[in-house]
C-alpha cells in the first residue's frame, strides 16, 4: 500500500493535466508522455490484468483485440493467456504507444501479438474474426463512439464479447448508462456487469446468428 500512495498523488496531478489538455470540442487520446497514468500499481490494484482477463473469460486459442492498447499493460498478459495458438491484436492510433509496446514484446520474446496503428471507427479490423474485444479506459477518448461500436460489432464473431471497463477519475470517464446508449444500438446486448466504484466492467455480446 505504501507504494501505491505516491502513484496516487502523481496520478491525480497527471489526470488534472490530461483534463486541461482535453478542454476542447473533440476527445483526444492520452499522450504517450502520460502513459504511466494507466500503467502503474494504482491502476493495477483496481483494474489488474488478471481481474480483467477473468472478466473477459480469456482462454487459450482465442483471438482478442486490445483496443486503445497504449504501451501494453494488458496486451502482454492477455497474449500469454491465449497461448499457444491465440493472438492479440493491439490497436492504437498513436505510433509512439505502439513503439513502446513493440519494445516490450521484443524484450519478453512474445510473438503472438500483432500491432495495428488505427483509430476506432476507421474499420481497420477484420470482420467476424475475434472472440473478445477490450476497451479499458478508452471509450471516452473515441470521437465517434457509435461508429466505433458498429466496427467492433462487425469485428466480433457471433457470440463474441465486447468488454468495456471504465474508472472514476479518468477525465474521459463514461457512466454505465452512457456506455449502454453508445454501444447497444450497434446490436450488442448487455450480458454481465462487474464491479462498481471506482472501476466497473460491462460485457456486451454480439448475438449468435439466428437460424433461418
Regions found by a protein language model. Give the residues of each.
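Conserved class I S-adenosyl-L-methionine
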Residues: 163-186
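A short acidic, Gly/Pro-enriched loop at the edge of an enzyme's catalytic core
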Residues: 121-133
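Class I SAM-dependent transferase core
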Residues: 2-59
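A short SAM/SAH-binding and catalytic strip from SAM-dependent methyltransferases
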Residues: 131-144
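A short glycine-rich, Lys/Arg-flanked "PGG" loop and its adjoining helix->strand segment in the class I
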Residues: 146-161
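Core SAM-dependent methyltransferase catalytic element
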Residues: 186, 195-212
Amino acid at each position: 500500500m505504501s507504494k501505491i500512495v505516491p502513484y496516487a498523488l502523481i496520478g491525480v496531478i497527471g489526470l488534472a493535466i490530461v483534463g486541461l489538455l482535453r478542454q476542447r470540442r473533440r476527445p483526444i487520446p492520452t499522450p504517450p508522455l502520460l502513459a504511466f497514468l494507466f500503467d502503474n500499481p494504482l491502476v493495477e490494484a483496481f483494474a489488474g490484468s488478471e481481474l480483467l482477463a477473468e472478466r473477459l473469460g480469456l482462454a487459450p486459442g482465442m483471438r482478442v483485440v486490445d483496443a486503445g492498447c497504449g504501451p501494453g499493460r494488458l496486451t502482454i498478459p492477455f497474449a500469454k493467456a491465449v497461448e499457444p495458438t491465440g493472438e492479440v491484436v493491439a490497436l492504437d492510433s498513436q505510433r509512439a504507444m505502439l513503439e513502446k509496446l513493440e519494445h516490450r514484446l521484443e524484450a519478453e520474446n512474445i510473438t503472438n501479438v500483432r500491432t495495428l496503428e488505427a483509430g476506432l471507427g476507421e474499420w481497420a479490423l477484420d470482420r467476424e474474426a475475434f472472440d473478445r474485444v477490450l476497451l479499458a479506459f478508452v471509450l471516452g477518448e473515441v470521437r465517434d463512439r457509435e461508429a466505433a461500436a458498429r466496427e467492433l460489432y462487425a469485428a466480433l464473431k457471433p457470440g463474441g464479447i465486447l468488454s468495456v471497463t471504465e474508472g472514476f477519475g479518468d477525465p474521459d470517464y463514461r457512466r454505465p448508462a452512457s456506455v449502454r446508449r453508445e454501444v447497444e444500438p450497434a446490436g450488442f446486448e448487455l450480458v454481465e456487469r462487474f464491479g462498481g466504484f471506482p472501476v466497473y466492467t460491462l460485457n456486451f455480446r454480439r448475438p449468435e446468428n439466428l437460424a433461418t
